[in-house]
Amino acid sequence: MGKKLLIVASKRYGDYVKEIAESMGCFEEISFVDNDREGAIGKLEEVETFYPEYNCAIAACDDGAKRLEWNKKLEALYNIPVLFHMDSTISPSANLMPGCIVEPRAVVGCGSTIGQATVIGANTVVEPYSFIGDSCTLKSGTIVKSTSVLEIGTETEQGTVLFTPLTSKQ
């Protein structure tokens, strides 16, 4: 059985997530489950009924906390993938947790960790040895300077430059 992906609770971001998944070339079928999307194969309350026909699922909500909440529900049945556009650059030593979505031309540097259900926007740069918490949304063009630590749920605006080093308490 090949990989089949459900994109859940996506609203308008779902089309972009589908294009990212398609660029990877590893899913034989990609469908939507949503209450407000024309062409969805089912409603949110029916999401469990698509297992085992679909073996992968990912939440694509705009809101980071809801994305994380949905992925936690989905992981009871489904594999939660990391989706990264083939035009992104991810260091082999970077650690991307389940539910991450990496948009085109984003760069994730060596030794960096990207938390669950985090979106790395197009043209965003996460410099080496940074830690990005769960359910963050780094919008297009964000730069996270080396060794930065971003808290759970951080959301940036386009073009933001961040340097938030881990500070030790003495």
Protein language model features and the residues they cover:
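Terminal amphipathic alpha-helical/low-complexity segments used for targeting or macromolecular assembly
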Residues: M1-M86
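Structural signal for interior beta-strand "rungs" in well-ordered beta-sheet cores
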Residues: L83-Q170
